[in-house]
Amino acid sequence: MYINTETEDLKTAIDAIRKAVKDRIAPLAAEVDDSGVIKPEIYDLLWDLGLMTVTYPPEYGGSETNPGTLLCIGCEEIAKACASTALLLIIQAVGSFPLMHGGRKELLDRIAPRIVNNRELAGYLVSEPGAGSDVKAIRTKAVKDGNDWVINGTKCWATNGPIASFYSCLCRTKDDKGVQGYSFFLVERNTPGLSVGKIEHKMGMRGSQTSEVILEDVRVPAENLLGELNNGFKLAMKDFDMSRPAIAAQALGISEGAFAQMETYSRERYTFGKPLCEHGMITQIIADSAALIEAGRGLIYQAADLYDKGKKNTKLASMAKFFMGDAAVKITTDAIQVFGGYGYTHDYPVERMFRDAKLTQIFEGANQIQRIVVAREIRDEQSK
């Protein structure tokens, strides 16, 4: 089933996002990549558009309808020009999810208005040096001490690590070899014992700041527990069902941006007396890329639609992520090929888009893991 993302109730939002991308975000994309910094006014723009809180409960600034779809639309449209900026939407949604959908009302009433009013950035502390896609391998521990929990461990690949005001931190709270025994806690940046470690210098999405976050005897009150004790793994999996379509939408946007660049160039560049687009091998690249984009769009917005309706979308979310992530790497690689030597230089955006696309195959569960998830979901469906 194809989901029409340009129905009347979404068109106003889409038009506003597209205008912001054209006028404000696209002109700065190369500078963001070169400097590794997104300017404060771009953060404010995303807040003003409502994209930083779109997946929050409505009472805290979220969308009453279609939050997953709107998140995907924002990621797709922005990533056409700047994938680093699109990543801000994803990490805000991911890092806030355990709080917004697992925090107790008293905690939410105290924290959420401050986050929205002060425009505070979220971080997500799950990955560790020995635990990436294998979430169950985390070693960061939280130990109960009176009315507090004391956290010790090192987290890595923390998007927004150096600049977040608060983090959702997954810890081991019970020795258990299965999925039980993990819990999320809200940890605020100014908590004693929390420090930022190594800042990563990445291949792509350089405008998004990524670092280690070190927790040494970090003490948080018991009320900062997010979700049920020892059931954090389940909350993390629900978070993935929201984030994976959004990452796929980011990959879709990168692909569309690269496609637009190479299709235009193929019409303007002449070789052997005719435009590139009239050479057989180039027409195949154009056609294959267009087909991948359309197929990926269908998967993405179907997964987002299921999420918005409160239905299980795990299989489609993982399908969308691995399909579109792999497609983005292929499309951006082919775009460089169409540009030839020019595409290999920093002077044309397809080089940046290629570097950005690679991350969509890796984060929020590597694409190899996504295939395992899909196969497991199919087995479960057939056994019912």
From Swiss-Prot:
It catalyses: cyclohexane-1-carbonyl-CoA + oxidized [electron-transfer flavoprotein] + H(+) = cyclohex-1-ene-1-carbonyl-CoA + reduced [electron-transfer flavoprotein]. The keyword Mitochondrion does not apply. Signal peptide: none annotated. Keywords: FAD, Flavoprotein, Oxidoreductase. GO terms for biological process: protein tetramerization. The keyword Flavoprotein applies. Belongs to the acyl-CoA dehydrogenase family. This is Cyclohexane-1-carbonyl-CoA dehydrogenase.
